[in-house]
Regions:
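Short, well-ordered beta-strand micro-motif
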Residues: 6-8, 55
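Active-site beta-strand-loop-beta-strand hairpin of nuclease catalytic cores
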Residues: 10-13
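Phosphate/anion-contacting hairpin/loop surfaces
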Residues: 15-125, 130-137, 145
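Basic, nucleic-acid-binding surfaces and adjacent catalytic neighborhoods in DNA/RNA-processing proteins
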Residues: 25-28, 33, 101-218
């Protein structure tokens, strides 16, 4: 759900996992020295930054995270599990994220549209890369105040959120630095970027010869 992984155990415990920016999960046989059973291929298990190990009957699950932005949260009942996700907005790829919902959350908010879309309490599953790409395709200024966004702009934001996220999934994600998908392969959506990481390059929009400039919206 959103950017979280959920493990449900037979004893009614729930484990909510967020991999942060650099976390990976490795599956290994109990007597194996390499991660041949890992989603990340037949590479050796990293020697550093292995923070959590779950031992099961026939294998172990290892959480590795060099930057340590991720977390594991154990919840001991369904009520707490459901409560955890009430603090998270609908996924941008879902039917619940539509023009009616977006219009409602934009109303009376003075935060700029980019920061609003990054707020996981309002919309979940969007990060910096995809918000940049969505607003570019929707032709919406990222600095524009949320309450000033017009209906036709709202429709385009919803439309391109779904188009871009689905396309990114089909391309295996965006491999920036060390990101890999569950097959162990790097994603390819970075080859489709229109604005992210394209500073000083030509705009790819038809009939536009401008250069892409980088501007900081917030720290």
């Amino acid at each position: 759900k959103s950017k979280y992984l959920i493990l449900v155990f037979n004893n009614h415990l729930y484990c909510v996992i967020h991999l942060g920016m650099s976390g990976t999960l490795h599956f290994m046989g109990l007597k194996k020295k390499t991660t041949n059973l890992s989603f990340y291929g037949s590479q050796s298990l990293p020697k550093k930054h292995n923070h959590i190990i779950f031992r099961f009957k026939n294998f172990k699950l290892i959480y590795n995270d060099p930057r340590r932005f991720g977390f594991f949260k154990i919840l001991d009942n369904k009520k707490d599990y459901l409560k955890f996700f009430t603090r998270i907005g609908p996924e941008a790829i879902s039917k619940d994220f539509n023009k009616i919902y977006l219009s409602k959350i934009l109303k009376n908010r003075t935060k700029n549209i980019k920061n609003l879309l990054l707020d996981q309490k309002l919309v979940s599953g969007l990060g910096n890369i995809y918000v940049n790409e969505i607003l570019y395709q929707a032709k919406v200024n990222p600095f524009k105040k949320s309450h000033l966004i017009e209906l036709n702009e709202i429709k385009r934001i919803v439309k391109y959120s779904k188009i871009i996220l689905n396309k990114a999934i089909n391309f295996g994600g965006s491999s920036i630095r060390d990101f890999k998908g569950i097959t162990g392969k790097s994603g390819n959506f970075q080859s489709e970027f229109k604005v992210y990481d394209r500073e000083e390059k030509r705009c790819s929009r038809y009939n536009c010869s401008g250069l892409i400039r980088r501007k900081i919206i917030s720290n």
